[in-house]
From Swiss-Prot:
Activity-regulation annotation: Inhibited by the beta-lactamase-blocking agents sulbactam, tazobactam, avibactam and 3-aminophenylboronic acid (APB).
EC id: 3.5.2.6
SUPFAM superfamilies xrefs: beta-lactamase/transpeptidase-like
Annotated organism of origin: Klebsiella pneumoniae
Protein name according to UniProt: Beta-lactamase CMY-2
Coiled coil: none
Induction summary: May confer resistance to poorer substrates by high level expression.
């Protein structure tokens, strides 16, 4: 009996110590500062905003300048260019269109753009565009493609290197086209559909494709070789890399994607789940719609090395997950993003109710971002 009581007491002590070990706001701040302050110095980053979602609650931290010339500090309202983290918005909006019955990932691309008459487009589905597996679409749409006619000409003349689904080659020209075609049945522009179906329902009031005049004061300058820059307009930019947002809105975005049960709109809730479904396996990584996932727990090396451009931008064999596997809570879900003057990173583990947003007004190497995020979240889990 004594043995049993002692055992129970030990178990209770262990379980209570787990709760007692919950971090205070000051402890979270210390953990974040110890990683971010030296990172900013080493990478010469003018300004950063970070949100940590710990036990489901957001904590915000800001450093440095949003505008060096005018001495404007980074605040919780500062707008940063998200770069390719914009693709996660594209994936969720596409998932919402699927949930509404407007599109199917199995649909041929030509159903939504009949003018694509080239033979190479036969057999390419929306799924392939959304997951970079169409057969080798290029990373960027060429700069001289400036209107819809030139865009059609570009896609008509593109020739695949592989059969659809053979390899994954990360490409703005792939998921960008998916986003544009996914909203066609709605009759809305991409920006309008994103605003009505994703941003407004999630109350992301400071997330923009086109930053309005009254928000320009909060729009940070990015810095490239010390010079202030903003992203240049381009074809399918909104769909691939065109979103700007604040650290508060991005924390809300992570919370919604980490646990969509509080999202009122059923199609959006389903869209969030579809974006984290697993459509292809590429090594340790699973490709979703915009989001990329790895099984949790994992070793730091697998995400840090996987984020290096030599791996992330390489053509790698893709194994189809058929039928797609539904979202897995025990996952490291993440996305990097860059423009000429900005670098962002978002990661979360739904099972742990733990996530991070890192926004910087300078582009710096992806592995450095991922390692910093890992170090912070590892200390908080």
């Amino acid at each position: 009996m004594m043995k049993k009581s002692l055992c129970c007491a030990l178990l209770l002590t262990a379980s209570f110590s787990t709760f007692a070990a919950a971090k205070t706001e000051q402890q979270i701040a210390d953990i974040v500062n110890r990683t971010i302050t030296p990172l900013m110095q080493e990478q010469a980053i003018p300004g950063m905003a970070v949100a940590v979602i710990y036990q489901g609650k957001p904590y915000y931290f800001t450093w440095g300048k949003a505008d060096i010339a005018n001495n404007h500090p980074v605040t919780q309202q500062t707008l940063f260019e998200l770069g390719s983290v914009s693709k996660t918005f594209n994936g969720v909006l596409g998932g919402d269109a699927i949930a509404r019955g407007e599109i199917k990932l199995s649909d041929p691309v030509t159903k939504y753009w009949p003018e694509l008459t080239g033979k190479q487009w036969q057999g390419i589905r929306l799924l392939h565009l959304a997951t970079y597996t169409a057969g080798g679409l290029p990373l960027q749409i060429p700069d001289d493609v400036r209107d819809k006619a030139a865009l059609l000409h570009f896609y008509q003349n593109w020739q695949p290197q592989w059969t659809p689904g053979a390899k994954r080659l990360y490409a703005n020209s792939s998921i960008g086209l998916f986003g544009a075609l996914a909203v066609k049945p709605s009759g809305m522009s991409y920006e309008e559909a994103m605003t009505r179906r994703v941003l407004q329902p999630l109350k992301l009031a400071h997330t923009w494709i086109t930053v309005p005049q009254n928000e320009q004061k909060d729009y940070a300058w990015g810095y490239r070789e010390g010079k202030p820059v903003h992203v240049s307009p381009g074809q399918l930019d909104a769909e691939a890399y065109g979103v700007k947002s604040s650290v508060i809105d991005m924390a809300r975005w992570v919370q919604a994607n980490m646990d969509a049960s509080h999202v009122q709109e059923k199609t959006l809730q389903q869209g969030i789940a579809l974006a984290q479904s697993r459509y292809w396996r590429i090594g340790d990584m699973y490709q979703g719609l915009g989001w990329e996932m790895l099984n949790w727990p994992l070793k730091a090396d697998s995400i840090i090395n996987g984020s290096d451009s030599k791996v992330a931008l390489a053509a790698l064999p893709a194994v189809e997950v058929n039928p797609p596997a539904p979202a897995v809570k025990a996952s490291w879900v993440h996305k990097t993003g860059s423009t000429g003057g900005f670098g962002s990173y978002v990661a979360f583990v739904p099972e742990k109710n733990l996530g991070i947003v890192m926004l910087a007004n300078k582009s710096y190497p992806n592995p450095v971002r991922v390692e910093a995020a890992w170090r912070i979240l590892e200390k908080l889990q």
